[in-house]
Amino acid sequence: MDFFDLDIEIKQERLPAECSLNSPLNYSLSAQLTDRMTPRTENVRRQRERLRSHMREHFRVKDLSTLDNDSTRLHARLTEDLITIQSPEIDSSVLENWPPLKSYIASLDYTLPEKTAFKWEQAAPYWNLFAQLRAILLQSQKIKKQETGTRELYSCVPLQIEFVEGVVLYFTDRGSKEEFTKSGELPSVTPYADFLAWIKIISQRAQAVLMAVILRVTDKGLSPLPESLLAIYQNVDDILKRAGQPAIDLLKLWEPLVITKLGELLGDRFGLEEDFRNTIRGEATKLAKNLFISRGLNRLMDILDQQTDAQPLFQFFGLFKHFAYPRVFSRDTIQAIQEVSDRPSSISAVDFLHDQCEIRKEFYIRYINAYHRAPGLDLSALSPSSFLRDSLERGKIPNERSPLYSNKEWYFVKFTKSIEWPVSDTLSTFLSDKAITRDRPAWIEDGHSGRDMSEKRLLLKFIKENFSSVADIVGAAEAIYNKEEDLLIALKVKEMELKIKGRGFGLMTFMPRLLQVLRESIAKKTQKLFPEITMTSSDLDMKKRKFMLSKKSDDRRGFIHVNKSLDINKFCTSQRQFNSNAVFSSLDELMGTFPLFSRVHEIFEKTWIVDGSSSDPPNLAHFTRILDECTALGLDTPHIWADGVFSGLKGGIEGLCQYVWTICLLLRVERVMQKTALTHYILAQGDNVIITIIVPVEIHRDGTIPEQESRRILSLSREIDLSLESELEKSGLTLKIEETLTSENISIYGKDLHCPQHLTLAIKKAASAAIISSEQYQDVPTFLSGLGTSLEALSECVNNKVGVHLFGVIMGVAGWRDLATHQTWRGWRYPYHKKAITGRIRASEMKLSKGEPTELSISVLSKRRRERETLIELLSNSLLGSALGMLAFPTPLDLEKRGVGDYITHRLTIARKAILSGHLDPRIGRKVESACNIPLSSRTDLSKLFDSPFSLNIATEEDATAVIKRQATKILRLQEIKNEKLRAQIDNMDKGIATLDAALAGATNINPRLNYMIRSITDEKESEMFVTKFASARTMRTLAMNHSSELPIVTLLEMKSQQKETYTIWRTKRPPVTMWKCSTVLAKELRDTSWGKNIIGGTSPSPIEAMETIQIDPTEWEDRRSQDAMSINYYLSRAGMDEQTAKLTRGFLVPYYGTQTKPLVAKAYLELKGNPRTNKALLLLSVRESLVKTGSNLDKLIIKLCSHALDIDVASLPALRAQEEAAAGEGLRGGIKESMSPVGPDNFYTNITHKVFNRKWATPYHVNIADFIIQGLIETRRHLLVNERMNGLLPVSSVKCTSCFREKEREFFDIPEEFTWKNESKTSDPAYTYFTTWCDLPRVSNLPEMDQRSATRLLGRGLALNRSSSGEIITKFYSMPMESQRLLHPVELLLGYGEGVIFGYLRSQHINHGALFHIGDESLAKKLRRYVLDTKTQHAKQIGYLFQDEDSLHELLGQGLCPYIPRSIPLTITELTNACAITTIRATEVILSTKTRIHHMPVQAIDESDVDTSRLAANNMQTILGDPRPMNLVHLDCDLTHNMVAWESEVELDILKSENFHIDGLLVELTARELPIGDTPWKQRDWTCSNDPKIIAKGIKTKSLFIHQGVTGAINLIPDLLVVIGGGLGGCAVPYLQEWPDTPIIFATLFDERERISEDGDLIVPPELLVRGMAPRMIEREILEAELCDITNEGNRRLLIRLVTKNKRGGKVVLIDEIENRGAPESLLQSSLQDLFEKLDKVCKLNSVHTVRESTVEQFSQRVNSIKRSRKAVTLHWNRYNRRDQFEALVIVKGEEAKSDYRISTITSAKAFRKIDEQLEIDGRLSSTQWSLPALPSREKNILFGYVSSVFLKMNLALSANDMDRERLIETIEGTAPGLISWKEKLEHRDHAHRSDIEEKGITQDKIFNLICLSWVLKGLRYGVWDTDAQSIVAQTVYITRGPKLCPLGEKPKRIFASFKLQSGKRVEDAKGFLSALLHLEGFFPLGEQ
């Protein structure tokens, strides 16, 4: 697809694929057309007939065979003759326009020599000849009406040319003297394609000579002299003229010959082996001799030998680009092929095919044998442990299920219509399968063996459509194949690659480059279509594959992984394009895509291929006949193209060699690696090799590598590269050193390119000249690909801008102007068409109706103007280069390896330089500006062009992503996509690009979180590359623009790569550990691994990785939060470990006990903060987690270091003295004192945050702040490592997490997740599964090592639970004789046994009853006693041996565990049994009294009381046991009920529109009276909420929704602004928002109260609902999550006032104050509120609504006075959701009320509440007599039911929604309540019960309390009387009547069965909580039984 996109532009009769430009097979076609051979197809026959009649008519020629048809000789002769008669003046008017060109180039800091300095006359002949031929070509392609009978002749004086029927006739005027053609006056004839090839050759020569002429002046010594070029061309023409077609074989050796000469010049650096040079030159001489052109060859070699400089010689590559050239094979291979092919092969075609099979066999067998352990393969060079050796000996490369091979999938294509299979398909598809089907099952994903039937079906279809019978094809193929199962057609998937520098991307312009990226991406989406077998994923991706491979990689520090990814020049790239286009065009047609496929494999020239596309089956006899026919004509055998069989292809068996290739390569690489003696892993597949070398290295403490170590690794790495290079060259493989990627860093950030400087570019070009073949630059402009290597070599090696640029301009003005701007992705738009005709230009395709004018005239501009315009357009376009048009300016060194963004940046830099230089022609300047859309008025403001990111379109501020998106959409729309799926894919991509566009807009650095968006467009591998492209484009641009004049491009690129350093490729967070399913096996495994660990392990990130987080200045916290939910990245503990491995192998473990040391470090930090040496001390303090020490040494060590750093005695700091206290009470939370727990105002939480961060910690979760402090310190350490200074503020880092901080801590320190018990089994009872797995004894084999005591404790549990013989268990733990077992720690054993017994009892309870009620410890103890006595014989069996040994017994007695003093030892059986029973009972009591946890359902929350009990218990336990070790103390909580499910919210999403809320309240006016100020003494108010977790008195959270109903009506105005302070979620605002839908809102609520439905049934409206409803209305979004509700902070008050002022100064504002009074000193909160309201009153018309709830009227009045803002009257609002047991109401203070200093007295308030009560009674009476209350709406019922049922659960009554029926409820409570008390037996026949009948001596107060509550409920349900005076209720007596049944409260039955009364009145507060909750039942059953 060079020069012209011929196959697309010029549609001909379908030629075989081989008839492309340089294929000698055209000769066969012209032989058929000229009667020398029988035509092979109907088409050719007809074409010949038409040609015949034309010749007869115009030339009187009867016999076509008399015509000259040797195009090779003809064109050589024509070239020679025509060049000699050309004029020496170059015909280009560019010379007239020299001045603007000169000033333009001056603007780029270059000087242009005078035009006379150039010797144009040397370039003129070729240039002028080319111009004439090009004119003929364009003219001939115009579409015009032709009169029948007229001839169209074209003249290239004196040659005449005529185009007839796809051939070209050449003849001369009869009058002219010269004879150009051999046949005199008769015309010579060649196919049209040959004519095109000739023009292409002329064009290429003209350009080469012109280039040489220009460079000779601008930069001497860079290019060969024009004379040398002309001489070479002349000699070549001479050779071709003499030898004809076969001489082309000699030209194919041209580049290898140049390489041999280069090798001489460059010497060792080039590294050519001697035998290679001799082979090539020998071949050339031999060939020349056979063709009798030795003298011509010698002359060529002389010219070569005259070149003494490497650089000009280097430009000789590509002179014969249009001819193929062979690859260099190893010597062995060449010999093997020669042995076969040197035999005379033309005797018989059958022999020839036989020889080809021999070659194939030679390749196949030679290596496959080695592969299957042939004795010939010497494996002794490999070390015995070598992975490779192992594989080879087993007989195959390991591929089953290896992660590396997951991308190998076969596709068997079912075609919907028959394809005319072109040549080259059959053999290659058959064979490519052959290589990989050695071991079929391994390759088929599902693993089923045998062949997929679809292959067979496809094959049969193919045969049926192409052959008369199956027998035909089988018979014909048997000559080549002998195996039936080889007859397959299968297509192999290759991963396409998304790399800007990939196949086809070299110097592409912007649009095609972009298109290619999209094309590949789409191709990947259309089922990763066909091309070749090699793996070409990106380097990063391959590195990741390598990580997966190296399972044995070393975890310790002090080892560095160096990864090398080798890039080898492969030997099959050259001919792909030509030989495969036909195949691919068929596929494209089938898939409905435009050119999408581009590649197959070719290898050997002499491969004969059976062609299925021909009309007849390929039978050998028929073939022999044709062969003879050709031989008779003297045609060269290998180049015959005939029916059914053809040759001359370099292709067919690449697939076969793939494995062979891999093995050769592996052996070579392994040999080099063995010498290094380092641990290494090699991954090879095809020509991709990745080596991982593990190098031991010294590392500093902080994780950095010392300088000398770096140098050592670097030199080692380079050494390995060089030895690899020389080793591989022995196989004829050249290594592209500069593309051999190596990571020599401690970790892989970005890619480190390492380039040893030894003329790498030259080697790259010389050794793989094919890299710049047409295959790579499919869409590059004509002159670039025509020049081939030279231009790219210049731009990369020479970078001479003037020469290249000038050349581009001359090309443009010479008529190629359109190419500068209008290259389309389908090919070229011809310059002089008035209207662009895209697609293929051919008259036959244009369907013209009669009479329609078909004029397509050439538009003619006046000559002068046209050239001037052209020049200006060219120059202005070239300034903006590839961003907008053609690439006339060369690419700077290596820039094409980088992204589009960098390219644009580079372009803008050049443009800016030129515009600002002042040399530029003003018209060019204007053009550039208009291209950038700069309005003319703002000419001066040019900086705008260069300072906005990527801006190509300034006026619209469009950035690069937008441009890319726009271009992409535009291009994709041009395609007519017939394939539905593909169209959908493209639409998807459009969407993806749009999202990406939005996310990338203006991003300085891509946030790693964007990765997921990118993945939706491309797949994972691509996204890596995709993201990196844009990662720091803005930075690049800034750098380029700031100092473009003095900044060399190299520095720019270095800066660029530093930018990329910060962009790590590991950016996904570790996924959360999944909850274990309820499978016994899994549960046991988990339990075993988590058992008995006292120390929690955390992985310490190395400092280098730790530095990666973003620091946030706490003062900007809010702003940052709203932009970005910050997350802490998960750092691997070792560079380069993949996540999977990281999960399985822990890094460096850091012990810490609970959180003990954290508060200490934090306090120490506080006290050190003012000290000038703080930084140093902080570093030391925070290094804590990387010191591998344990226990208190850790703190001692830190103290020592700090003292040293600060020169003070740190131990004297008061905070560190707290250490002893903490260590003494190390319990559940590792000794955190009460002050450090997050409850209460003056605690550690508040202090530390205010001091450390100067404000409260801004987090949505309520957590123990000590945990955050450490995190802060670690962040500080990172911060210091980066910045080395502190600005007085700690950097904040927040965690994105949806649950409590424990998880954050686990994530941060990499502590394994505490396993959550989650039952997924459908059948079994969850609790049963739980009991049988989680709490059993772990399997001993799995236990971690333990000290003897813990082990004994565990053993005790096992004895109680497992019932196995004692000896058996003990011997598992210790290998000691039986008799010494009794000397183990008996106390531990017994306590463990006690735990086991308790657990066993609970388990048996569960098994018997199917449910567990919450059992108090006291009752449990009694039940256990009974249980132990029932099972005493069992206990005697298990622990009896303890009492048979005196020492053990005395130890038990000493501890007070055995109150039984035996008379003698051994004991009798009875005594033994009793002793065991009593001792076991005692042990269980000890366990219960210390609240030791029996491992149970995970605990949800831990509060202060737990901490206290555990600390107390720890101390008790130590005194009981005399054991100083801390124990793991937890509290027993069996909340597991059989049928209670968690209450789930059913709130619909339209909650905000709900009508259900409407409830009318009562309004009562309060008017202030004058009172002396000190009239009522201030009372400290009691807390209304008990801290006992068993009691709920928090009040329903959604209550605020209901309480605020109807207030809007009472306020009676529409406010301008609503302000909400306090009040959790701000549910209180909902009723207001319903009423005033348009009012804006400011939220200052406590978002940290976002619980879910807590376990006690509280409900929270999901925040999403509220926020979704309100977000559009919020004025200040940031405040949403702020902690403004703490209005004791003055800054918060100021902020709130400022906001109100800013938004609605003087407007009507409604303020809702939901601030509860708990949790802060009364006076402070009161005064703050008062202050806030008064100040707000001044800036607006304030109406406020306050929630007030107090326990006494005095407090209520006191509170109202403090908030009423001196108003004379306030209003109380009350409805039935307000509590009646306390004084609770909404107080509404209106702004328009008159002011006065009066106060509201207690009496007024009391009256108001009395009024409310009266009103209620009246309502109640009314309703009961006249009408019934409406039923509650179902949603409210659900809310209230969840609340009520949770309270019942606390009282051991599990209710379901079905029980909410009055009759059933009364029945349930009456019947089950007495069951709370255990009676000896059911005494139903007795009418009373004595105390002694109740099992417990003192029935617990809890039980009685529960009974009181239940009987209170009964009374309400029966009579509708809901008493609210808790004080009197608690004092009453509860009666139980016969049945036994519970009586309603206050009702004394005739027959009392039992009665109970609370002993103490302390339960009042509890009762308030319980009753206020149960009062909601009134809503369900308001009026009692009617």
UniProtKB/Swiss-Prot annotation:
Swiss-Prot/TrEMBL catalytic activity: RNA(n) + a ribonucleoside 5'-triphosphate = RNA(n+1) + diphosphate; a 5'-end (5'-triphosphoguanosine)-adenylyl-adenylyl-cytidylyl-adenosine in mRNA + 2 S-adenosyl-L-methionine = a 5'-end (N(7)-methyl 5'-triphosphoguanosine)-(2'-O-methyladenylyl)-adenylyl-cytidylyl-adenosine in mRNA + 2 S-adenosyl-L-homocysteine + H(+); a 5'-end (5'-triphosphoguanosine)-adenylyl-adenylyl-cytidylyl-adenosine in mRNA + S-adenosyl-L-methionine = a 5'-end (5'-triphosphoguanosine)-(2'-O-methyladenylyl)-adenylyl-cytidylyl-adenosine in mRNA + S-adenosyl-L-homocysteine + H(+); a 5'-end triphospho-adenylyl-adenylyl-cytidylyl-adenosine in mRNA + GDP + H(+) = a 5'-end (5'-triphosphoguanosine)-adenylyl-adenylyl-cytidylyl-adenosine in mRNA + diphosphate
Domain Mononegavirus-type SAM-dependent 2'-O-MTase: 1592-1788
Main location, first listed in the record: virion
Domain of life: Viruses
Keywords: ATP-binding, Host cytoplasm, Hydrolase, Methyltransferase, mRNA capping, mRNA processing, Multifunctional enzyme, Nucleotide-binding, Nucleotidyltransferase, RNA-directed RNA polymerase, S-adenosyl-L-methionine, Transferase, Viral RNA replication, Virion
Its EC number(s): 2.7.7.48, 3.6.1.-, 2.7.7.88, 2.1.1.375
GO MF entries: ATP binding; GTPase activity; mRNA 5'-cap (guanine-N7-)-methyltransferase activity; RNA-directed RNA polymerase activity
All copies of domain RdRp catalytic, residue ranges: 560-757
Annotated function: RNA-directed RNA polymerase that catalyzes the transcription of viral mRNAs, their capping and polyadenylation. The template is composed of the viral RNA tightly encapsidated by the nucleoprotein (N). The viral polymerase binds to the genomic RNA at the 3' leader promoter, and transcribes subsequently all viral mRNAs with a decreasing efficiency. The first gene is the most transcribed, and the last the least transcribed. The viral phosphoprotein acts as a processivity factor. Capping is concomitant with initiation of mRNA transcription. RNA-directed RNA polymerase that catalyzes the replication of viral genomic RNA. The template is composed of the viral RNA tightly encapsidated by the nucleoprotein (N). The replicase mode is dependent on intracellular N protein concentration. In this mode, the polymerase replicates the whole viral genome without recognizing transcriptional signals, and the replicated genome is not caped or polyadenylated.
The family this protein is said to belong to: Belongs to the rhabdoviridae protein L family.
Protein name: RNA-directed RNA polymerase L
